[in-house]
Amino acid sequence: MAKKVVAEVKLQLPAGKATPAPPVGPALGQRGVNIMEFCKRFNAETADKAGMILPVIITVYEDRSFSFVVKTPPASFLLKRAAGLEKGSGEPKRKNVGKVTRKQLEEIAKIKMPDITANDLEAAVKIVEGTAKSMGIEIVD
């Protein structure tokens, strides 16, 4: 019989740098998960993606065991990196803070394809384009 799921925890952590400090410790500690075991497994799995922020979904079971799935980096993180920005615009409709090319949008969409609900690359590009516009990043051809 399958294990009974008690909780599902969603976090965004730096690749290869998970520590028992917040946000990991409190989120997993209150559910009785071995925090150090999670940190070691997460860091080992994400060591090759250093410098990226990765969303992770941790499934906690009744016997306090866990499994986790690492997703692709958020589109906003990839867009900021492509445009060379620290953060997006405070007023995206009025003030643009950076530029990305259509080719860069396609690259980001290809990276995001496994996690986006889009059926094809063109639809994924439109989703990423919307994220860019909401961050005040201009798309140039």
Curated annotation (Swiss-Prot):
Relate the protein's function as given in its record: Forms part of the ribosomal stalk which helps the ribosome interact with GTP-bound translation factors.
Q: What is this protein called?
A: Large ribosomal subunit protein uL11
PANTHER family per record? 60S RIBOSOMAL PROTEIN L12, LARGE RIBOSOMAL SUBUNIT PROTEIN UL11M
Question: How is the protein altered post-translationally, as described in the entry?
Answer: One or more lysine residues are methylated.
Q: Which organism's genome codes for this protein?
A: Pseudothermotoga lettingae (strain ATCC BAA-301 / DSM 14385 / NBRC 107922 / TMO) (Thermotoga lettingae)
Which is a Pfam family this sequence falls into?
Ribosomal_L11_N
- InterPro entries according to UniProt: Ribosomal_uL11, Ribosomal_uL11_bac-typ, Ribosomal_uL11_C, Ribosomal_uL11_C_sf, Ribosomal_uL11_CS, Ribosomal_uL11_N, Ribosomal_uL11_N_sf
Top-level taxon = Bacteria
Q: Which NCBIfam families has this protein been placed in?
A: L11_bact (TIGR01632)
